[in-house]
Structure formats: C-alpha cells, structure tokens
Amino acid sequence: MEKPRGVRCTNGFPERELPRPGASRPAEKSRPPEAKGAQPADAWKAGRPRSEEDNELNLPNLAAAYSSILRSLGEDPQRQGLLKTPWRAATAMQFFTKGYQETISDVLNDAIFDEDHDEMVIVKDIDMFSMCEHHLVPFVGRVHIGYLPNKQVLGLSKLARIVEIYSRRLQVQERLTKQIAVAITEALQPAGVGVVIEATHMCMVMRGVQKMNSKTVTSTMLGVFREDPKTREEFLTLIRS
C-alpha cells in the first residue's frame, strides 16, 4: 500500500515530515529593539520573554514535539499509557520554565524598604529546582544569599522569589548564580552581594559519569564581598554554620 505523500513512518507509526534544511519557513514575529542607552541599574526591570497567551498558543506544538520524541524512541503515542503523555509533558515543561513568564520588577517593586541597617543580611538553604539547558534534565540544590545593605533592604521572601524566577528557566549553574547576584545588586545597589549554589545535576547522575554523590558548587561575589576578604569569609562562615 502506498504511503500518503508528505508523511513518513518511524517504527511503523506515521509522522509528519520535518522541513528540509534551507526550506522556507513562516516569518517569525520580530521582537522590538532594545532601547539604546538604558542604564544598567534598570536591567532588572526588563520585560518577560513569555506570557500566558504564549503558553496557550504554543502548547499544541509542544505536545506534538513530545509525540514525535515518543515515536523516535520506538514507542506508540496511541497506546493507552501514553495517550495523554505528550500533553502532560508539554504542560510540565511550561511549568519547569515558568520563570520566563515573570520579571524581577513584578516581585520587587513593592518590597524594597528604606532602612538604616548596615550589617549583613543572609538567607540560606533556599531550595532550588532548575533544568540543565544542555540535556534538558533537572539539577536541584540549595542557594545561599547574603548582601550588605546600603540604606535599603529587601523583603526576605523576595530573595527566594528571585531564585525561583531565574531557576525556572533553561540554565547552567554558573549563569544562574551570577544572574541572582546581579539582579539583587541592580535592584538594591547594596555595598556587596554574595551568592553560593550547591546542586546535584541529573546529567551527571543518570548519564555520563553516573556519579550519585557529586555536587557542584558555584559562587558569585560582588562589591565588598569580592574586594574584602574578611567580609567574604564572614559570609562563607555563616552559611556553613
């Protein structure tokens, strides 16, 4: 029996033909150009890359992509146990990356307070869940944040919210650490900021070297945390206590 044109089969299951390299594609909606001369201190107020409307619009395409993955693995997306899997996986992936729908200004605008406090503020052991952008598998761990105020303080729960916004994206741990520190610095203009992340990467546990007990530790030190060894040591001692 002749196969329908425009359709190919993988492991006996029909699959939509992928566009050939170089083939014309629908024009993508261009993003507005970034404003020139923007001040670095305003970078934390940048717009969100994804909206709820984008989620609804892209969910069918994302589910179709998961169906294609199942076929390529030799599975039948139509069997009972997998009937709803593409939609579940698509919805889950949108949740895992929901940080793209949020901005720092959403969280911080009403939670920055004038306060004459000049001693270190630390929130440690903040649970963190993120997705490795290289293998699309999770890495999980804890985040420790400290900053030295400069006439302003931040609501403590907002530090955890900053972690949530940046970790719920496709990430590498090194960049995540720096993004958290830079966001706090640009929003508060403190004397200094320190961020340390300890995480276990599933791409090292479930594949590759398969080391169950390995942890990756990254740090970013800004301001006096970078320039003054005593301040840095105080922070590192307190998060270990």
From Swiss-Prot:
GO CC field: cytoplasm; cytoplasmic vesicle; cytosol; intracellular protein-containing complex; mitochondrion; nucleus; protein-containing complex
E.C. numbers: 3.5.4.16
UniProt source species: Rattus norvegicus (Rat)
Maturation and modification: Phosphorylated.
Subcellular location: Cytoplasm; Nucleus
Site (Involved in pterin ring binding): W87, F96
Propeptide residue span(s): 1-11
Role: May positively regulate nitric oxide synthesis in endothelial cells. May be involved in dopamine synthesis. May modify pain sensitivity and persistence.
Modified residues (Phosphoserine): S51, S72
GO biological process, one term: regulation of blood pressure
Pfam families linked to this entry: GTP_cyclohydroI
Gene name as annotated: Gch1
Name of this chain's protein: GTP cyclohydrolase 1
Cited PROSITE patterns: GTP_CYCLOHYDROL_1_1, GTP_CYCLOHYDROL_1_2
Highest taxon listed in the record's lineage: Eukaryota
UniProt keyword terms in alphabetical order: Allosteric enzyme, Cytoplasm, GTP-binding, Hydrolase, Metal-binding, Nucleotide-binding, Nucleus, Phosphoprotein, Tetrahydrobiopterin biosynthesis, Zinc
Catalysed conversion reaction: GTP + H2O = 7,8-dihydroneopterin 3'-triphosphate + formate + H(+)
Broad EC category: hydrolase
Induction: By cytokines such as insulin, interferon-gamma, and phytohemagglutinin in adrenal gland, macrophages, and T-cell respectively.
GO molecular function, one term: GTP binding
Subunit structure comment from the entry: Toroid-shaped homodecamer, composed of two pentamers of five dimers. Interacts with AHSA1 and GCHFR/GFRP.
Similarity comment: family membership: Belongs to the GTP cyclohydrolase I family.
UniProt: Zn(2+) binding residues: C132, H135, C203
Pathway assigned in UniProt: Cofactor biosynthesis; 7,8-dihydroneopterin triphosphate biosynthesis; 7,8-dihydroneopterin triphosphate from GTP: step 1/1
Activity control mechanisms: GTP shows a positive allosteric effect, and tetrahydrobiopterin inhibits the enzyme activity. Zinc is required for catalytic activity. Inhibited by Mg(2+).
InterPro entries, sorted: GTP-CH-I_C/QueF (IPR043133), GTP-CH-I_N (IPR043134), GTP_CycHdrlase_I (IPR001474), GTP_CycHdrlase_I_CS (IPR018234), GTP_CycHdrlase_I_dom (IPR020602)
Region annotation Disordered: where it falls in the sequence: 1-58
